[in-house]
Amino acid sequence: IARKIKRIIEVALKREGLELAGWRDVPINPSVCGEMALNTLPQIEQIFVNCPQEISAENFNRRLFLARRRAENKFEDLDPYAYINSLSSDSISYKGMVMPDVLAEFYPDLLDERMATSACLFHQRFSTNTLPEWRLAQPFRYLAHNGEINTIQGNRNWAIARSKYFCSDSLPDIKDIDPIVSLNGSDSSTLDNMLEVMQAAGMSIIQAMRVLIPPAWQANEMMDADIKAFYEFYSCQMEPWDGPAGIVMMNGRYAACCLDRNGLRPARYVITKDRHITIASEIGVYDYPADAVIKKGRLGPGEMLAIDLLKGELLDNQKIHDQIKDGAPYKSCLLYTSPSPRDGLLSRMPSSA
């Protein structure tokens, strides 16, 4: 079965004009696994794909996304537990059904001195509404989630219902990747599915998350009119994915954290003199000396904090709003917005940097 699945992936890559560079058996240490994890221990391999010359990183990742989704639809019937952790030029995902403090022991790669990164996203909580599975271990491809999406059934139903009207110049073959969200995964995995589709269609991860998990804007008389127009424009096309939810997310450009509008999950941050920032739900995650800290705080309901990894810039909630409101003339867009889904969702999504 493994050989068949690998062949399916290779064919999907070739369809997107991508060249396979090779496969690697990922070193693992099963001795740290519990009984259930050992009984379901998967075969773990890493794929390497050459980037074609003269295409952008964004286009490369979009092709990888399409290849992955087509492959997943093909091999699902062969093995429903087969799973592609990530297929991206920006990030790599190490996940497992093991205790958090032994993840680096399970994956010796993480102990290798040559392993280096400017940003890392991790998750140490355990599922409360789904049975543990290797493929459902967090983080997912873009996000990790603390809490629940209590509107998940409605969000899934609307995503599937609207998918026939989704269209984007960036994803001309979007019908090939139906269903666009998982119906049998966790609530967090479904949110991750929706986030990656919106990014592949041309939205930034920050803008996409503000559409999916907006603040309470309707009755906020202090909110900038242009920002309110942004949220009103997208409210006609996407219902809020309501928590309580604390979300951390990362792609090659941004690392960010946001709370849903209820604000019932903690998200605390610390910034140090040597330009390190740590955002976590628990204070005990970081142990910086007091004299090394220049700022600390917590996110409020509906707020977001992000780091532009390319520019090395911290974006607070106001800067994020300034960025997304300048992406399009949303007040004017509202004049042409209809609540009808038949107008095409992704095609009417102005994308901001």
Where is each model-derived feature located?
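Extended, highly charged
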Residues: 1-118, 122-124, 128, 174-241
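Catalytic or ion-translocation cores adjacent to nucleophile or general acid/base/metal-coordination motifs
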Residues: 150-195, 230, 268-283, 287-291
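Short, compositionally biased
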Residues: 159-172, 316-335
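Conserved catalytic micro-motifs used in adenylation/nucleotidyl-transfer and phosphoryl/amide-
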Residues: 120, 132-149, 153, 239-278
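Short, glycine-/Ser/Thr-/acidic-enriched flexible segments
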Residues: 1, 99, 126-128, 148-150, ...
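Conserved small/polar residues in nucleotide/adenosyl-binding loops
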Residues: 336-343
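Hydrophobic alpha-helical segments, chiefly the membrane-spanning helices
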Residues: 347-352
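Phosphate/diphosphate-binding loops
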Residues: 232-236, 246-247, 283-317
